[in-house]
Amino acid sequence: MRNWLVALASLLLLAGCEKPAEQVHLSGPTMGTTYNIKYIQQPGIADSKTLQTEIDRLLEEVNDQMSTYRKDSELSRFNQHTSSEPFAVSTQTLTVVKEAIRLNGLTEGALDVTVGPLVNLWGFGPEARPDVVPTDEELNARRAITGIEHLTIEGNTLSKDIPELYVDLSTIAKGWGVDVVADYLQSQGIENYMVEIGGEIRLKGLNRDGVPWRIAIEKPSVDQRSVQEIIEPGDYAIATSGDYRNYFEQDGVRYSHIIDPTTGRPINNRVVSVTVLDKSCMTADGLATGLMVMGEERGMAVAEANQIPVLMIVKTDDGFKEYASSSFKPFLSK
């Protein structure tokens, strides 16, 4: 996945129609995309300039810790570390890596944050896009240096048992950034907010009209932007993964930016969009990608077994078809 850069799906924000409360809107660049924050003003809250200064600092810290586009970031330094000796990392990076490992198990290996060399080989990372589709020999060489089983956590350190192991947290760290900002807003006494970074969102409370925040899930169309569903997630985070915008074509074949760890190639299934709800945007972010890799049958089976609210949009000969897990269906009926 092009790190920090491409929002896998656009989620449109909708409001109600009662007399509006005072709403503050903050925005800015981060992680190769943008952030948008809306919150309802309350007595005793710090002024918006003070809040935004701290939000920018927090997001810059996430970049300094986890961006693979910054050669001196904590994660980049670990990737450049070719020894099997433990490498000390921050509590924040450790938290995100731990969740990535947990989600790897939950998705039966479909979410693997060590596929960075394959992502780069296909031209969706810091490396330039290849002039031709990679050969089997090139794929096998990159696959030999991937696998989350080669990554170990001990205390506050990470270690690897193959020197070339490369960790790319782009499938999960953007959601972490949303959580960092949302947690900060709550620490400041803000009870009604929407935090969005590159399409990943966390919500709490009510919007300016005194009704729950409403989110539009985009129809997975390349040519135009339109709405597939409108939901009220409540106090949940929402993340969507899709392959319908970030891809390249060669010789009439479309290659998605989402890589299947088992083949080393871009995914090749009928699922074009996966939306996940969770209390943590980091978790929703990672699950959306992992379930997309798994495909319709396996992905929905995992969603049902673990009571995960999931909406899959699948391409058929007649257009698009929705598949909602049992935990997601109540959100569709609101």
From Swiss-Prot:
Catalytic activity from the UniProt record: L-threonyl-[protein] + FAD = FMN-L-threonyl-[protein] + AMP + H(+)
PROSITE patterns (UniProt xref): PROKAR_LIPOPROTEIN
One term under GO cellular component: plasma membrane
Assigned keywords, A-Z: Cell inner membrane, Cell membrane, FAD, Flavoprotein, Lipoprotein, Magnesium, Membrane, Metal-binding, Palmitate, Signal, Transferase
Stretch forming the signal peptide: 1-16
Lipid moiety-binding residues (S-diacylglycerol cysteine): 17
EC number: 2.7.1.180
Cell location: Cell inner membrane
Coiled coil: none
Lipidation (N-palmitoyl cysteine): 17
Binding-site list for FAD: 31, 69, 110-112, 168, 174, 259
Family: Belongs to the ApbE family.
Protein's recorded name: FAD:protein FMN transferase
Native species: Vibrio cholerae serotype O1 (strain ATCC 39541 / Classical Ogawa 395 / O395)
